[in-house]
Amino acid sequence: MVRVCRVVPKDWSKFQPVGNVIPRTRFIVFKTPINSQLSTKIHKEQRFTTNDLFRQLSERGQYLGLVVDLSDTDRYYDKKDITGMCVQYEKVNCPGRGFIERDDCVESFHQVIQDYTDKCDDPDALIGVHCTNGINRCGYLICRFLIDRLGWSSHEAIDAFEQARGYSIEKGAYVMALHKAAKDKRDKQVDSDSDSSERQRKKKNKRKHREIVEHENIVLINTIIGELGSQAASVSGTDYQNSPNGVSVDPGQPQPHHWGFAIKRSKYAQLNQPVANGANTPPEPSEGTPQEEEEFEEDFEEIEEETETEPGKGQSVSSKRRARRNRMQKYMQVMQRGRFHEIQAIREEVALSHGSARD
């Protein structure tokens, strides 16, 4: 059984029951309807029930989509009188004392309005809000929504509410709290703008630093490629038609062999020279140190690898030079494209080839 109030709220009768729609919003404010039992205690012309509410709105060509009850009791009328008319009903209990200190009431009201506007596709369906008299608590919460969610100033919100309702907010503490809420929002927005400027500055510095690092990497890679080109030119001799280091070679002129090849060939000739005492007489031991003899043997083995090429096994010197030339051309093409990941892969390939050669 629904509990009912036995006393008409104080000063309830002196306020007009329904105000006008707040401009640029869907809010309409009214005082709380009362049940038929309470209506018998006042004059007929002062009565205001849920039936009177819907009748007055219908005469204006208006209709409700949501009713938000801000009173701290449910004894004035039965909410089924609202939901029975296919109108959504929401309750946000707001006490008469200490109300402006209750941030949870503000957040609950904001959430109820936001949820309804997000789901409702009918822009003409009004949002009815009432407390006991439809003045103080209604005025504070509606103005807070206009300030916090719609970006209105406190003066704009208060003026719009008071003109639509026909009455001023009576409690000065509520008005001061609205001005303070608007000031806090402005200060917060200034701090947010300064934080945004700081983020933009850091982003710009980060982008500038990245460009500097990329430029340094390109210079370093160009230097490495230049050194590799110089080394390849010194090793390959005149077989390069277009040297990476810019040295032009005339293919018509005979070019001398590399100095290392000349030394190895002379040592190989000395090793194969017949001995004066006879073919079977072993050569006289060299007067060099054991380290020099070991180096001589290694050079001899290298000359054998360069001068003797068995069919189907290994590569000739000219084949190696051609392969080396192709690799250098590939390196230059990669550098011209300027793609960092390809350049990095070339660097790793060169490092691995040098490491394997040493091993």
From Swiss-Prot:
**Which SUPFAM superfamilies does the record cross-reference, listed alphabetically?**
(Phosphotyrosine protein) phosphatases II
Q: Where is the Tyrosine-protein phosphatase domain?
A: 16-191
Recall the GO molecular function terms of this protein's record: polynucleotide 5'-phosphatase activity; protein tyrosine phosphatase activity
Question: Gene3D superfamilies this protein is in?
Answer: Protein tyrosine phosphatase superfamily (3.90.190.10)
Q: Could you tell me which Pfam families the record lists for this protein?
A: DSPc
Residues of the active site: C131
Query: Which InterPro entries is this protein grouped with?
Result: Dual-sp_phosphatase_cat-dom (IPR000340), mRNA_Capping_Enz/RNA_Phosphat (IPR051029), Prot-tyrosine_phosphatase-like (IPR029021), Tyr_Pase_AS (IPR016130), Tyr_Pase_dom (IPR000387), TYR_PHOSPHATASE_DUAL_dom (IPR020422)
Residue ranges annotated as compositionally biased, kind Basic and acidic residues, are 184-199
Q: What is this protein called?
A: Probable tyrosine-protein phosphatase pir-2
What is this enzyme's EC? Answer: 3.1.3.48
- Renumbered to this chain, the Basic residues biased-composition regions fall at 200-210, 319-328
Gene for this protein? pir-2
* Skewed-composition ranges (Polar residues): 234-246
Q: Where is the composition biased (Acidic residues)?
A: 290-309
Q: Where is this region: Disordered?
A: 184-211, 234-259, 274-328
Source species: Caenorhabditis elegans
Describe the family membership recorded for this protein in Swiss-Prot or TrEMBL: Belongs to the protein-tyrosine phosphatase family. Non-receptor class CDC14 subfamily.
Which keywords label this protein?
Answer: Hydrolase, Protein phosphatase
PROSITE patterns from the xrefs? TYR_PHOSPHATASE_1, TYR_PHOSPHATASE_2, TYR_PHOSPHATASE_DUAL
Under catalytic activity, the entry for this protein gives: O-phospho-L-tyrosyl-[protein] + H2O = L-tyrosyl-[protein] + phosphate
